From Swiss-Prot:
Cell wall formation. Catalyzes the addition of glutamate to the nucleotide precursor UDP-N-acetylmuramoyl-L-alanine (UMA). Pfam families: Mur_ligase_C, Mur_ligase_M. The gene is murD. It comes from Dinoroseobacter shibae (strain DSM 16493 / NCIMB 14021 / DFL 12). It is found in: Cytoplasm. It comes from the Bacteria. It is an enzyme of class 6 (ligase). This is UDP-N-acetylmuramoylalanine--D-glutamate ligase. ATP binds at residues 127-133.
Length: 464
């Protein structure tokens, strides 16, 4: 645990008592503060009270008497679509609002790190898609190379749950837009922006607000080095804003296009990763044989991870060795098994159209299981990527809407995962891939995308 200093003797309100909220309360108490907690969920409050934390509704102004700050969990909206009443009240009273990510970065100014000759290096990864794989891959490569590394944030442990670590250690953080938009301190040594596509737009008031939340990672003090995916206009803009000259090597551009210019570029094209600096190739990796990184989208993730690891001084061969032993993450292009020549792939994390499109590009002869709770924008952007789909099997609340969105693709409304898997198996032929890539949220039928993926795996197991 990282004790949160700077609030000793003060009362700090904590809103939301899930994994990050409870860890925040513990870290505040360890630093000498008195947490005052609240969660609308009775069971969450009971868990906090069992650890000795006081819980009280933060509904009225007098509840904030003597409160120095409010720390909120990332899933609680503070602006769009409607501000949470407790957060709005705190803001109206002039009480600072922060989250655990902001507290983590503020902790570097406290005595807990004084014994180290060098503070931990922090790599923070954000973007619409590929954050988890990129973060986990960076962590895996660094660990395999013998670097003391911890993985936290939106993946792995809560950021305040990690240990201060070893002298010169590394912390890899996956950060969602929910986490970056409110943190009062964001000072990573290396910041990674994988890509941008429409997602969570209701939470951010539109695409501009969504990009602004991601961009904050690069504007508060600025990282020592930025790794920027430049295949979208927003990435190009961000790289341009951060560069002071064409050859500025503080910015590493990651692209699927042919490398050009005098800067530091890492490209992933047709299964090959190449590094160029000052117009010369300085490293390359054949990504095609690596089973844990299937498809062009994972090759882009690998390029981002490569750039981050090179920033820390790893040699290309060290990175290649780490890539080769990477097993991939559950629910992200996860090969579940093969039966009668049919391959089953679980990409339940493909919760938006862009990530589903990338999954569809990674495989041939697809029997596609899709649907759930449809997000803004519809399926029009998927149309160019449906050529390899033999048939779609549609599930969830938005199954009928999905059917209307893909009129030229053979499809069947199955509603449930069990029916979809059974129908796909009955019609599959050797060489087909049965792919779960929902292009939708899971909350109509499941608690989260993990449960949806686990249900797919359980249904597939009946046929293996």
């Amino acid at each position: 645990m990282i004790p949160v200093r700077g609030f000793s003797g003060e009362t700090i309100a904590v809103l939301g008592l899930g994994r990050s909220g409870l860890a925040t309360a513990r870290a505040l108490r360890a630093g000498g503060a008195t947490p005052l907690c609240w969660d609308d969920n009775t069971e969450a409050r009971a868990r906090a009270e069992a650890e000795g934390f006081a819980c009280a509704p933060l509904k009225h102004a007098d509840a904030f008497d003597g409160v120095a700050a409010l720390i909120t969990s990332p899933g609680i909206p503070h602006l769009y679509p409607t501000p949470n009443p407790t957060i709005a009240l705190a803001m109206s009273l002039g009480i600072p609002v922060d989250n655990d990510i902001g507290l983590f970065f503020r902790s570097f100014a406290t005595p807990d790190w004084d014994e180290f000759d060098s503070l931990p290096r922090v790599i923070a990864v954000t973007g619409s898609n590929g954050k988890s794989t990129t973060s986990a891959l960076i962590h895996h490569v660094l660990t395999a190379a013998g670097r003391p590394t911890q993985l936290a944030g939106n993946i792995g442990r809560g950021v305040l749950d990690i240990d201060p670590g070893e002298d010169g250690g590394i912390v890899v953080l996956e950060l969602s837009s929910y986490q970056t938009e409110l943190a009062r301190a964001l000072t990573p040594d290396i910041a990674v922006f994988t890509n941008l596509s429409p997602d969570h737009l209701d939470r951010h008031g539109g695409m501009g607000g969504y990009f602004a939340a991601k961009r904050r990672l690069f504007t508060i003090g600025g990282p020592d080095r930025a790794v920027i995916g430049t295949d979208e206009p927003e990435g190009l803009f961000l790289a341009s804003q951060l560069s002071v000259a064409p050859a500025d090597d503080r910015v590493i551009r990651v692209t699927s296009a042919k490398p050009s210019g005098p800067g530091w570029v890492v490209s992933a094209r047709k299964g090959f990763l190449a590094e160029h600096r000052k117009g010369r190739q300085t490293g390359s990796i054949d990504l095609r044989p690596i089973p844990g990184l299937p498809g062009a989208h994972n090759h882009q993730n690998a390029a981002c991870a490569y750039a981050a690891c090179r920033s820390l001084g790893l040699a290309p061969r060290q990175i290649e060795a780490g890539f080769a032993s990477f097993k991939g993450l559950p629910h992200r292009s996860q090969i579940v098994g093969t039966a009668n020549g049919v391959t089953f792939v679980n990409d339940s994390k493909a919760t938006n159209v862009d990530s589903a499109a990338k999954a569809l590009q990674a495989f041939d002869r697809i029997r596609w299981i899709a649907g759930g709770l449809e997000k803004e924008g519809g399926l029009a952007a998927l149309t160019p990527h449906l050529g390899g789909v033999r048939k779609a099997y549609l599930i969830g609340r938005s199954a009928a809407e999905f059917a209307l969105g893909i009129p030229d693709t053979p499809h069947e409304v199955c509603e449930t995962m069990a029916r979809a898997v059974a129908a796909a198996v009955a019609e599959a032929e050797p060489g087909d891939t049965i792919l779960l890539a929902p292009a939708a949220a899971s909350f109509d039928q499941y608690d989260n995308f993990e449960r949806r993926g686990e249900d797919f795996i359980a249904e597939v197991a009946k046929y293996l």
